[in-house]
């Protein structure tokens, strides 16, 4: 039986994230992109968006390139993944570029389409759920696993995301 593109995207993401765990956790990393895809599926049936949701961290956090995604899943999926990928500024400490990277995400959301907003919402809601679970277990010590350890700055970022998701308010 032939796999759908979404099923191929799941397998691709599983392989790309093999052996990785979530920040400050033993949870297999693939749980996050899978949860993001489930969240996205509650807002759209667009297969490109669902593929992008499960693949959204492959370029940012693994050796996978945008070209590989483009070749395997098409231009639209690759573009969506790149929209939700940060420029990590190789060679600079992540803690030093955290605020700049987050501001770039907020700025990009100002002119984003519905599909991009669904993708970002799915990613960030999954992150917030993970943060909440960690908070219940570790309290404020959970922030020690993050590049940005100031919970007020984290709040600034996630509130900013919520404010920018204007196309999803209805």
Task: Enumerate the language-model features and the residues they cover.
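Active-site helical microenvironments for divalent-metal-assisted chemistry
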Residues: 1-170
């Amino acid at each position: 039986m032939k796999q759908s593109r979404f099923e191929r995207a799941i397998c691709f993401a599983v392989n790309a994230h093999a052996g990785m765990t979530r920040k400050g956790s033993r949870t297999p990393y693939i749980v996050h992109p899978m949860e993001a895809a489930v969240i996205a599926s509650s807002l759209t049936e667009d297969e490109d968006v669902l593929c992008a949701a499960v693949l959204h961290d492959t370029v940012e956090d693994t050796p996978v390139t945008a070209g590989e995604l483009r070749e395997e899943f098409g231009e639209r999926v690759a573009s969506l993944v790149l929209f939700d990928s940060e420029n990590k500024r190789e060679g600079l400490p992540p803690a030093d570029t955290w605020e700049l990277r987050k501001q770039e995400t907020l700025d990009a959301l100002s002119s984003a389409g519905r599909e991009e907003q669904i993708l970002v919402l799915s990613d960030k809601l999954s992150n917030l759920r993970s943060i909440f679970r960690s908070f219940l277990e570790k309290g404020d010590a959970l922030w020690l696993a993050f590049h940005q350890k100031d919970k007020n700055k984290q709040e600034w970022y996630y509130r900013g995301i919520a404010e920018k998701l204007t196309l999803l308010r209805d």
